[in-house]
Amino acid sequence: MKEIKKTMTKQMTARRDDTPLHTAVREGKTDLLLEMIGEHDGVELKELLAEQNQSGETALYVAAEYGYTDMVKILMKHSDSVLAGTKAKNGFDAFHIAAKNGNLQVLDVLIEANPELSFTFDSSKTTALHTAASQGHGEIVCFLLDKGVDLAAIARSNGKTALHSAARNGHTVIVKKLIEKKAGMVTRVDKKGQTALHMAVKGQNTEIVDVLMEADGSLINSADNKGNTPLHIAVRKNRAEIVQTVLKYCEVSRVAVNKSGETALDIAEKTGLHEIVPLLQKIGMQNARSIKPAEKVEPSGSSRKLKETVSEIGHEVHTQLEQTGRTRREIQGIAKRVNKMHTEGLNNAINSTTLVAILIATVAFAAIFNVPGQYTDDPKDVPPGYSLGEARAAPRPEFLIFVVFDSFALFISLAVVVVQTSVVVIERRAKKQMMAIINKLMWMACIMISVAFVSLSFVVVGEKEKPLAVGVTAIGALIMVSTLGTMCYWVIANRIEGSKSSPASMMSDPELADSKHNRKLYAV
């Protein structure tokens, strides 16, 4: 039996396209998880944690779904807000799936690590609070509401709030908690124009009807976009007990006609609801054709409409403020990441320049002691006019040019190495200024070492093959002039672009609009 179960697990894992990390989390192997995390760091670790299976689930999502609190704690230590908010293909992230499954401890860990996770929602704009309310997880709803976050006011894309869903699914405790937290929610309508009472009468929980009526008695005659009152809806759904509960309130209208020209009695008679018809007739409910035109009333009054409008405006303003705050935080986060990328780029450039400077210094130093023809190092064989240790090519003008330019290349490179290893610059602008100067010095060093190489090539090829050395000089000159010409063009273009964009940057967000942040070239 164990072997069969093991085989089934492997097959399911293969179908999910789980990574080893997913599998370790799914099987609850905390030690293996720690071992895998310990084998990676930095970018590699982030990539490991960000990997998704076929369903778009990250390892954090799986841990939250299964309710592995310890694993969630471990993973959150190495996860940023972007990774923690990664959504699976079902539109849920780790926080949302934990709320759906009623994992309170997991939610506590997630919201403590990143409070903004409570604002996450799926493709239909369903928040974790909404999902928890629909599922009847009272502890989760209380937990989210007690965090002081006004999630209760956020509606789904169809306009339904958490109160609508809780009322429809008959979760009395949750309805009470939501009303206690935000009493004005009872008048909120969805895109169909229906209140929470309209949703409650579709179910079978009479207690919720009483709770909502206690909160706001005017709901009894509120009409949706089709003119249906809660009584119309209850009759259409054949909810006899709900109809009895609604009829006990004296405020209920007996002459309410919907946009189809029907009273609740018309609907009951048309659909053959013999149990409900007597209940309606008992309170004096009439058919629409029996009601005099003067007696017909629109179920929703202007005062209720005004209240709903004010409530909706307040909700929209609050939502916009929350969205603005979140957007601002996201922009600041992006700016920080961009700044980090710029800093890393500068550091990489500094390290690369140091290596190149060391290389040029090494080559220049070695070249002076390895000239063609070597030196007069034999005391018994010193040519006339030479001294012991003198280079055999020393009298030639090409050698003189080589020595001068090779020395320049050596000492310029050494100067760059000394500056790079001695000066510690923290501020980014100062780093860029230093890199700009060092880059110019490296240009000079490259030119010097190139001239030294070309001059020495004349010595190497000899007089007979002098055209070959001339060809090498032409090729080198062409390449160096083209390269330096292009670099100079970039310098000028970059500075012109910076001068043009500076006035605009003063009028925008300093976090992102700094023209220097948007340049593609640095320290040229």
From Swiss-Prot:
One Pfam family cited in the UniProt record for this chain: Ank_2
Q: Which UniProt keywords apply?
A: ANK repeat, Membrane, Phosphoprotein, Repeat, Transmembrane, Transmembrane helix
Matching entries from Gene3D superfamilies are given as: Ankyrin repeat-containing domain
Fetch the SMART domains from UniProt. Answer: ANK (SM00248)
Q: How does it sit in the membrane?
A: Multi-pass membrane protein
Q: What stretches of residues are ANK repeats?
A: 16-45, 55-84, 90-119, 124-153, 158-187, 192-222, 226-255, 260-289
Q: Which InterPro entries match?
A: Ankyrin_rpt, Ankyrin_rpt-contain_sf, PGG_dom
The name this protein carries in UniProt is Ankyrin repeat-containing protein At5g02620
Which organism is this entry from?
Arabidopsis thaliana (Mouse-ear cress)
